[in-house]
């Protein structure tokens, strides 16, 4: 398992998405009418409870607060409520977001167990929570507000048809395209490149850690310890390099 290189930036990105989602859901209404306050409240509540329940899942599974679950939780709540944000009560939004957070956290654990890479947690957040959000329309939506004259069971069947048809089109269409591309240009890097990091292996962009590793490797091969490790008081690797130079 590779740890994220910058958790604070990832968390900031999630907060920016959260803020932007108010405009996304509110703007999708198409008019500045009485639905807007309900949409904004439901969006906020679902994201908040997605954060709470996903974080709780991280604590239960890993026995400690896990940043990944805290970052994906509110996003899962946002995805879950998007389809029904204008047609459910705030109490329903809490339930939808809570279940979305649990589904997202469970999917993260499942993907790690079956060893499927998903570096941006798109499957837990957008696929799993998106499916749940689509189903939630039939379970919690106010059909009178929606103008739907179906039973909940009938609407649930319609939602499932939509999930299956759109999901099949996207999966098989993407699979065929990527399979063809992969035949000419392999999409996955090798194990060494993956461990080294794509910034270095593909873009030749060095990092403090990589520079420190290069010095240590060179010293081990040449047994010449006159080469100094990079020093920087503002990075972990630079601080280690400073102390290493003192030691040597």
PLM region descriptions:
Residues 1-219, 227-233, 237-247:
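Hydrophobic alpha-helical transmembrane bundles of multi-pass membrane proteins
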């Amino acid at each position: 398992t590779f740890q994220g290189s910058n958790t604070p930036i990832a968390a900031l990105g999630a907060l920016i998405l959260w803020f932007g989602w108010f405009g996304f859901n509110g703007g999708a209404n198409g008019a500045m009418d009485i639905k807007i306050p309900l949409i904004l409240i439901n969006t906020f509540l679902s994201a908040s409870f997605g954060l709470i329940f996903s974080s709780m899942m991280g604590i239960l599974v890993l026995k400690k607060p896990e940043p990944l679950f805290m970052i994906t939780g509110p996003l899962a709540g946002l995805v879950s409520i998007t389809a029904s944000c204008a047609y459910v009560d705030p109490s329903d939004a809490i339930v939808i977001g809570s279940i979305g957070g649990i589904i997202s956290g469970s999917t993260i654990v499942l993907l790690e167990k079956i060893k499927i890479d998903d570096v941006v947690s798109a499957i837990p957040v957008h696929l799993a929570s998106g499916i749940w959000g689509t189903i939630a329309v039939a379970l919690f939506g106010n059909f009178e507000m929606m103008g739907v004259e179906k039973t909940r069971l009938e609407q649930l069947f319609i939602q499932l048809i939509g999930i299956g048809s759109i999901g099949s089109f996207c999966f098989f269409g993407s699979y065929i395209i990527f399979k063809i591309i992969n035949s000419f240009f392999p999409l996955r890097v090798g194990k060494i490149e993956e461990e080294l990091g794509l910034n270095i292996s593909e873009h030749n962009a060095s990092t403090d850690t990589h520079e420190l590793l290069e010095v240590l490797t060179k010293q081990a091969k040449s047994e010449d310890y006159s080469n100094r490790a990079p020093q920087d008081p503002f990075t972990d690797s630079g601080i280690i390099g400073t102390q290493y130079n003192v030691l040597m």
